[in-house]
């Protein structure tokens, strides 16, 4: 019972072979230290560093910032973006916007011009039933109705 079991030697041999294969794979992955000198660091980036076209870094930054500033100023001029400076200007702008809103609201309630006045040359018989009659049309219709009644008598 306490002796060796049959076939356990092969198991040990197989385990040893597998362990050897793993160690061989790990050994190939180890990095060997290099004897070459370390790579030199790039020079530090300063404002006098030449970037491109023989222009220094501060030239490029200045030109780019002027370009962006000119675009912002142009857009503000086109869309009339102005920051008011005083309380009086702020209140005046508020009142102006309020008056403009009231004007547009009242303008929407006004009926179209063709409903308010008679258009010369318009055929009155083709008039829509839903449209609003003007005073002149009502008077003319009343006169025609009275004339027909007198003609029938």
Curated annotation (Swiss-Prot):
Disulfide bonds, paired cysteine numbers: none
Tissue spec: Expressed in brain, kidney, liver, lung and cochlea.
Cytoplasmic side stretches: 80-153
Record localization: Membrane
Xref: InterPro entries: TMIE
Membrane topology: Single-pass type I membrane protein
Extracellular side: 29-58
Protein name: Transmembrane inner ear expressed protein
Organism this protein belongs to: Mus musculus
Organism placement in taxonomy: Eukaryota, Metazoa, Chordata, Craniata, Vertebrata
Originating gene: Tmie
